[in-house]
Swiss-Prot record:
Induction: Up-regulated by mannose. Is under the control of ManR. Is subject to carbon catabolite repression (CCR) by glucose. Forms part of an operon with manA and yjdF. Keywords: Cell membrane, Kinase, Membrane, Phosphoprotein, Phosphotransferase system, Sugar transport, Transferase, Transmembrane, Transmembrane helix, Transport. It is a multi-pass membrane protein. The keyword Zinc does not apply. It comes from the Bacteria. Residues 123-456 form the PTS EIIC type-2 domain. This is PTS system mannose-specific EIIBCA component. It is found in: Cell membrane. The gene is manP. The EIIB domain is phosphorylated by phospho-EIIA on a cysteinyl or histidyl residue, depending on the transported sugar. Then, it transfers the phosphoryl group to the sugar substrate concomitantly with the sugar uptake processed by the EIIC domain. The EIIB domain is also able to transfer its phosphoryl group to a specific histidine residue in ManR, which leads to its inactivation. The EIIC domain forms the PTS system translocation channel and contains the specific substrate-binding site. GO terms for molecular function: carbohydrate:proton symporter activity; kinase activity; protein-N(PI)-phosphohistidine-fructose phosphotransferase system transporter activity; protein-phosphocysteine-sugar phosphotransferase activity. The modification Phosphoserine is found at residue 365. It comes from Bacillus subtilis (strain 168). The chain crosses the membrane at residues 133-153, 174-194, 199-219, 221-241, 256-276, 297-317, 336-356, 369-389, 396-416, 436-456.
Length: 650
């Protein structure tokens, strides 16, 4: 039986790839052929072809954002949230094997299909689709404004102010421009999720009107609440017009003229004459109330936000709190996102610390999992805690909620602010956090509370326990990729080269099973020489400078005895990877304290597409998350054995 699947989450960093990995592993265990297309932060990967869709027996979509299903009309289709793809992959595949899923007709014709959509909660899915496109605008705007204020701001009684004639004023204005797109993008892509392309224009127009109070005589706009209302109103108006029966002569112009024009008029006039002013008043009152919160009321809000963020670790409850904090950034209230930014990273960091402090409480594989979780927490990826919660929810979930609530309260009391819609120490390092010292105190305190709670609640492991197979540890790619995508992704078109697997860009000549270097610099030189002898480099010194520049930004040792030094340089002739093993290990300033033993060096030409190195990082880390695979790779003795194992990375 042949199955196909698509996975996608609002942010496209963690859940997308965890669900894909779990579906693939579950299919392997059940002896079923499956291909998984991922629609993540760097675009569509492993795209399903028309021939594959034609030959498939069933399709599984595990997504929390809108996925175009038109290509699956007439096929058996199971549509669920991405969390089900992570936690219940075998159950989903078993349903497909049993034929217990409906045939997809269209978004409007299939009753059973609509029933399936209701189970997935379409309102949440449409909302998260808008959020996923909105967040990059908040991140770009917040980072640019934070950098401009940090480097160009002058202290005044009103705080940091950038002089009008300063270069940094231009940077601040670019950041503000990014913020101005936030609500139109949110509304536009909510409508797009509901009505496809005909909903995009009316959604964006409605979002712009919602954000511009002058349309309805309001001093302030209707904010993100107005954007959400505009998105749903535009989407369902477009969908309603789309369903109207019209003469065949008019059908060709329906999606490009009739639907966008009339849906835009409906949402625009509704906001100007009916909705805009009342919603603006509600939003203004909410903003004033939040800004005026003091004492016990602000602590209560912090407790609620901390609990929501950690309760389902990237799920629907988490996303509602995250959306609230993100929206407040656009209104200039950074002290809501501050406690959220702290709460986001506490679950994975706290559990990583727990595995270090309570070694008798965790299996060796779980301790390795803890290292990966800790690393992911540094980059604000809450999902690193999911494997622990899946194995022991009754002890882990209360512990991480207690830690996140503690950290959020400390952050709220300390007036911690965050100008970027993201969390974890990475945002503090990038200068996006106000009151950095209190931020780190809150993170450390909350993480220690989580670690202590978990270790108090958990019993010592038995001599040789058998662990049930659950969701695997999240890929180190999320930590590596999060570090790489902290700058805005310029394009999701992802100019990828032809390589489909690692051995397309690595040859036996680029493998050294017994590295001789004693320091990280020695290892870098050794691998660069291999690349040079293979003809991959135009200049050894030029490429080494690119590698060292990258290391200065932060270590490329991602933990679990892995280092992935990489550089994009004019000194590189073609994309290549060199690999070496240092059996005794070498200090690489790893985030989890482990020495690097498996070293992959990535070389990419400067003029290549912006996502090539991210694709290679994902290829590597998806496989390297497998404890057994890393052990097998460390045990190879010859170049041939290593190359054969590397053939599995694709």
């Amino acid at each position: 039986m042949k199955l196909l699947a698509i996975t996608s989450c609002p942010n496209g960093i963690a859940h997308t790839y965890m669900a894909a990995e779990n579906l693939q592993k579950a299919a392997d265990r059940l002896g079923v052929s499956i291909k998984v297309e991922t629609q993540g932060g760097i675009g569509v990967e492993n795209k399903l072809t028309e021939e594959e869709i034609r030959e498939a027996d069933a399709i599984i979509i595990a997504a929390d954002r809108s996925v175009n299903k038109d290509r699956f009309i007439g096929k058996k289709l199971l549509s669920v949230g991405v969390q089900d793809g992570i936690r219940k992959p075998e159950e989903l595949i078993q349903k497909a094997l049993n034929g217990d899923i409906p045939v997809y007709r269209s978004a409007t014709k299939s009753e059973s299909g609509n029933h399936q959509e209701k189970k997935q909660n379409p309102i949440y899915r449409h909302l998260m689709n808008g959020v996923s496109f909105m967040v990059p605008f908040i991140v770009v705007g917040g980072l640019l404004i934070a950098v401009a204020l940090t480097l160009g701001g002058e202290k005044t009684p009103k705080g940091l102010v950038i002089p009008d004639d300063s270069f940094w004023k231009t940077i601040e204005q670019i950041g503000s421009a990014s913020f101005s797109f936030m609500i139109p993008i949110l509304a536009g892509y909510i409508a797009y999720s509901i009505a496809d392309k005909p909903g995009l224009v009316p959604g964006m127009i409605g979002g712009y009107i919602a954000a511009t109070g002058s349309f309805y005589d309001s001093a302030s706009g209707a904010g993100f609440l107005g954007g959400i209302i505009a998105g749903f109103l535009a989407g369902y108006a477009a969908l309603w017009i789309k369903k109207l029966k019209v003469p065949k002569a008019i059908q060709p112009i329906m999606p490009i003229i009739i639907i966008p024009v009339f849906a835009s008029l409906i949402v625009g006039l509704a906001f100007v004459f009916l909705i805009g002013a009342p919603v603006a008043q509600i939003f203004a009152s909410l903003t004033v109330w939040l800004a005026g919160m003091k004492g016990s009321s602000s602590i209560l809000l912090a407790l609620i936000l901390g609990a929501m963020i950690s309760f389902d670790m990237g799920g629907p409850v988490n996303k509602v709190a995250f959306l609230f904090g993100s929206a407040m950034i656009g209104e200039g209230n950074y002290e809501i996102m501050g406690p959220i930014a702290v709460a986001i990273c506490i679950p994975p960091i706290g559990l990583g610390i727990a595995t270090f402090l309570g070694k008798r409480k965790f299996e060796a594989s779980q301790r390795e999992m803890g290292k990966a979780a800790f690393t992911m927490g540094l980059f604000g990826i809450t999902e690193g805690a999911i494997p622990f919660a899946a194995q022991d929810p009754l002890r882990v979930i209360p512990s991480i909620m207690a830690g996140s609530m503690t950290g959020s309260v400390i952050a709220m009391i300390g007036n911690v602010g965050d100008r970027v819609a993201h969390g974890g120490p990475i945002v503090a390092v990038l200068g996006a956090v106000d009151h950095v010292l209190m931020f780190f105190i809150a993170v450390i305190a909350g993480s220690l509370v989580t670690a202590l709670f978990v270790n108090v609640l958990k019993k010592d492991i038995t001599a040789s326990p058998v662990l049930s197979e659950t969701a695997p540890t999240s890929a180190p790619s999320e930590a590596a990729a999060a570090n790489e995508i902290k700058q805005p992704i310029q394009s999701q078109k992802a100019e990828m080269s032809e390589f489909k697997k690692l051995t397309d860009i690595i040859s036996p000549e680029l493998i050294e099973p017994n590295l001789s270097g004693e320091t990280s610099d020695d290892i870098i030189d050794e691998l660069i020489q291999k690349l040079s002898r293979r003809g991959a480099l135009l200049s050894e010194s030029g490429f080494k400078q690119a590698i060292l520049n990258r290391e200065q930004q932060g270590t490329t040792a991602i933990g679990m005895n892995i280092a992935i030094p990489h550089g994009k340089s004019e000194a590189v002739r073609e994309p290549s990877v060199a690999f070496g093993i240092k059996r005794s290990g070498v200090d690489w300033n790893s985030l989890d304290g482990s020495e690097a033993k498996l070293i992959f060096m990535i070389a990419v030409p400067k003029e290549s597409g912006g996502n090539q190195h991210l694709k290679i990082l994902q290829m590597l880390s998806r496989k390297l998350m497998d404890d057994n695979y890393r052990e097998r790779l460390l045990s190879v003795q010859t170049t041939e054995e290593a190359y054969k194992l590397l053939e599995e990375i694709e």
